Curated annotation (Swiss-Prot):
Keywords: Hydrolase, Metal-binding, mRNA processing, Nuclease, Nucleotide-binding, Nucleus, RNA-binding. It is found in: Nucleus. GO terms for cellular component: cytosol; nucleus. This is Decapping nuclease RAI1. Decapping enzyme for NAD-capped RNAs: specifically hydrolyzes the nicotinamide adenine dinucleotide (NAD) cap from a subset of RNAs by removing the entire NAD moiety from the 5'-end of an NAD-capped RNA. The NAD-cap is present at the 5'-end of some RNAs and snoRNAs. In contrast to the canonical 5'-end N7 methylguanosine (m7G) cap, the NAD cap promotes mRNA decay. Also acts as a non-canonical decapping enzyme that removes the entire cap structure of m7G capped or incompletely capped RNAs. Divalent metal cation. GO terms for molecular function: metal ion binding; mRNA 5'-diphosphatase activity; nuclease activity; nucleotide binding; RNA binding; RNA NAD+-cap (NAD+-forming) hydrolase activity.
Length: 386
C-alpha cells in the first residue's frame, strides 16, 4: 500500500461533471438536550427579520452545545433508521459525509489560506469521510474564535429574528425575536446526490423553510439558508462578498437548498438590509464581473476529482471486500475476538502543495468507535452481525 498518493489537479479543459439534483431521503432534529429525534421537531419557519433589529440581542443568555466530537453519528444513525424500516439509504460505491466536508472539496481551487485534513474509511461499499480535528488544532481554533465570539453570535441572532420555531415565538422578546439561542438545536436534511458517476449521501443543517407556521415539511423546494455580512461600503467589501458567495453557493447547492437570504449588518450589529439570492443564479452574478473571483465549473471538477480519488483508493480496503467471509458470520468474529480493523486513510490539503492521500494504518475499535470514527454497534449492524 503506497505511503502517500498525490492528487493531480484537474485540467480546466476537461469535461465538467454534472451534479445530480439532490433527493431528500430523511430529516432529523437535534433537540435542546442535543438528543436526536427522527422528525421535524426542530424545523423552523422563515419570517422576514425586522430592519433595525440588534443582532447582539440575547448574547449573555445563549446556550452553547458541549464541545464533544460527534463524528458522523446523526447521519449514520439516520441511514440505519431508514434501512431497518425498509426504506432506501445510500447508493453503494460512493461517499457518505457531512455537507461541510464536500464544501471544502468543492471550494478547494480557491482556498488560499487554510489547510485541512480529513479521515476516510471504507465499509459496506461506501467511503465514510469526516474532518480530522486533533485536540491541539481544536484548541487553537477555539482561541482564535474567542476574539470574534460576538461577531459569530450575530449569525445565530439573525436566525432567531428570521424564524418562528415550532412552539411559536416567546411573548417577551423584541419584535421578531424567535427565542434565545441554543446551539444544541438543529434541523438536518439527509440527501442522495452524485457528482458525475459517484454517488453521494450527504447530511447538513438547514436553517428554516418557507411555509406557513405549523404546516408540514415542504421538502427541499421550501428550504432556506440564512447568512450575515457586514454592510458593503466600498469596492473592497464588494470583492470580499463575491468571494463569500462561493461558500454560500456551495453549501446550498450541495444540499439542494434553493434560496439564500443574507442580512447586512453594521459594525454595531444592527441589521440594515436583506437580500434574497437564488442559489442556482449565484454563479452568474459573479460571472458577469470584469474579473470573476471563482467559477462553478472548476469547483465541480475539483469535487469529482477528489471523490474519484477517494473511491478508487479507499473502497478496495473495505473489510467486507478483504474479509468477505465476515459478513453475517458471528462465529468467525467470536473466534477472532474482535471485528476486522478499519484501514484508516488521511486526506490532507495544503493551499501551497495541493492534496494528497496516505494510509494511516489499521485501527480496530477505540473507545467504542471502529477506526476511531464509527460506533461499534453501527459497524456490527453493517456487517450483518446484529
Amino acid at each position: 500500500m503506497p505511503h502517500s498518493i498525490p492528487l493531480l489537479r484537474p485540467n480546466p479543459a476537461d469535461p465538467v461533471p454534472s451534479y445530480r439534483l439532490p433527493h431528500l431521503i430523511h430529516t432529523y432534529s437535534h433537540l435542546p438536550t442535543r438528543a436526536i429525534s427522527h422528525d421535524d421537531a426542530s424545523m423552523a419557519y422563515y419570517s422576514l427579520a425586522p430592519i433595525g433589529c440588534n443582532l447582539t440581542e440575547g448574547f449573555e443568555r445563549r446556550i452553547e452545545r458541549e464541545d464533544e466530537e460527534e463524528h458522523l453519528d446523526g447521519l449514520v444513525e439516520s441511514l440505519e433508521w431508514l434501512i431497518t424500516r425498509g426504506r432506501k439509504g445510500e447508493r453503494k460505491g460512493g461517499i457518505i459525509t457531512w455537507r461541510g466536508m464536500l464544501t471544502r472539496l468543492i471550494t478547494m481551487p480557491y482556498e488560499t489560506r487554510d489547510p485541512w485534513e480529513m479521515t476516510a474509511i471504507a465499509l459496506d461499499g461506501s467511503v465514510y469521510l469526516e474532518l480530522w480535528d486533533p485536540p491541539e488544532e481544536k484548541a487553537k481554533r477555539k482561541r482564535e474564535q474567542s476574539a470574534w465570539e460576538k461577531q459569530g453570535y450575530m449569525g445565530y441572532a439573525y436566525e432567531s429574528f428570521s424564524t418562528i420555531p415550532q412552539e411559536g415565538r416567546p411573548g417577551n422578546g423584541p419584535e421578531g425575536w424567535g427565542g434565545d439561542v441554543n446551539t444544541n438545536v438543529q434541523w438536518a436534511n439527509v440527501v442522495r446526490s452524485a457528482i458525475g458517476e459517484i454517488p453521494l449521501c450527504i447530511a447538513g443543517e438547514v436553517d428554516c423553510v418557507k411555509a406557513e407556521p405549523g404546516s408540514p415539511n415542504p421538502g427541499l423546494s421550501g428550504c432556506m439558508e440564512l447568512k450575515t455580512n457586514k454592510v458593503i461600503q466600498h469596492p473592497g467589501h464588494e470583492a470580499m462578498f463575491h468571494k463569500k458567495l462561493l461558500k454560500h453557493w456551495a453549501q446550498s447547492w450541495l444540499l439542494g437548498i434553493p434560496e439564500v437570504v443574507v442580512g447586512f449588518r453594521d459594525d454595531d450589529g444592527i441589521l440594515r438590509s436583506q437580500t434574497t439570492f437564488d442559489t442556482a443564479k449565484i454563479p452568474y452574478l459573479v460571472e458577469v464581473l470584469n474579473k470573476p473571483s471563482w467559477s462553478p465549473n472548476r469547483c465541480l471538477q475539483s469535487l469529482h476529482s477528489v471523490c474519484s480519488f477517494l473511491t478508487k483508493n479507499v473502497l478496495p480496503t473495505d473489510p467486507l471486500v478483504t474479509y468477505p467471509h465476515i459478513r453475517g458470520n458471528r462465529q468467525a468474529v467470536k473466534e477472532a475476538g474482535e471485528l476486522p480493523p478499519a484501514v484508516v486513510w488521511r486526506l490532507a490539503f495544503d493551499p501551497k502543495k495541493g492534496c494528497e492521500l496516505h494510509a494511516v494504518g489499521e485501527v480496530g475499535v477505540v473507545d467504542g468507535r471502529w477506526g476511531g470514527m464509527l460506533k461499534e454497534e453501527y459497524v456490527r449492524w453493517r456487517m450483518g452481525l446484529e
